[in-house]
Regions:
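Alpha-helical transmembrane segments
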Residues: 7-19, 83-87, 154-158, 208-214
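Membrane-interface loops
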Residues: 28-29, 71-153
Length: 253
């Protein structure tokens, strides 16, 4: 077992421990206390800005963001596809299995801040945190993140992930569990990224094109987010992540 696999297993085990702790009464009370404290900060931030930031964790947005790394790294390409396909089933499966309700289903509406709509479905793990840290881990494992920037980027991704608490969509533990699970997957699948196979690469390409087309379509028609404001500016996320690639290719010409 190499170092990446060991770290992956440790982080995955941490996620499982957090899931178990999530059922203890003292942890539930602490989770609620921290939620109320962090969530109250959201009331002092512009709702449009909060919505814009929190949707950077949307899977469709991150698929668009992955286009540039995919363009430059075959390893990242293999990792993001394999991790995403497994991650979809893992994240959704845990939500159904654990069936822990969101804050909106438990906390009185007048006791916390929420960016509409009020979400009340399954809470654990946070899909946005899962997707953010899966994407970040793919960048790390594929060698696209310099060590000097690792801590800074971890902090930035955590800020984005915890906006889910600020908008009233998730408990703090949901974020930690989602981030741990998402970060562990590419580490556990790292060996797949080093295997060169024309058949696998062709399949990966097909899956990536399908997922990318779905993401682009839903963002362009304004149907990728639960938030109306995000749906109105889906084009902006596309512009942010695809314009650098267009610029670099124009420079080459």
């Amino acid at each position: 077992m190499n170092r990446q696999h060991k770290i992956g297993f440790i982080v995955f085990a941490l996620a499982l421990v957090l899931i178990c702790l999530n059922y203890l009464d003292p942890v539930i009370a602490l989770n609620n206390y921290i939620f109320i404290g962090l969530n109250s900060v959201g009331a002092f931030i512009n709702q449009s800005a909060l919505t814009f930031l929190t949707e950077f964790g949307n899977a469709a947005v991150l698929l668009i963001a992955s286009v540039i790394p995919v363009y430059y790294s075959r390893k990242f390409f293999r990792l993001i596809i394999s991790s995403t396909l497994i991650g979809i089933f893992l994240s959704r499966g845990l939500k159904i299995l654990l069936d822990i309700p969101r804050p909106g289903a438990i906390v009185q509406r007048e006791d916390f801040f929420v960016v509409e709509p009020l979400l009340t479905s399954q809470s654990v793990p946070s899909g946005h945190a899962f997707s953010l840290f899966l994407f970040f881990s793919c960048l790390v494992v594929s060698g696209m993140i310099k060590k000097n920037y690792f801590a800074l980027l971890i902090f930035a991704f955590l800020i984005l992930a915890f906006t889910r608490v600020l908008v009233g969509a998730h408990w703090p533990m949901d974020i930690l569990i989602g981030a741990s699970l998402g970060f562990s997957l590419p580490l556990l699948l790292a060996s797949l990224a080093n295997r060169s196979s024309k058949i696998l690469d062709t399949l990966y390409s097909v899956f990536f094109i399908i997922l990318l087309c779905i993401a682009l379509y839903t963002m362009l028609i304004g149907n990728f987010s639960t938030y109306d404001f995000a749906n109105e500016i889906g084009w902006l996320y596309i512009l942010i992540f695809l314009s650098p690639l267009l610029f670099l290719n124009l420079v080459k010409i």
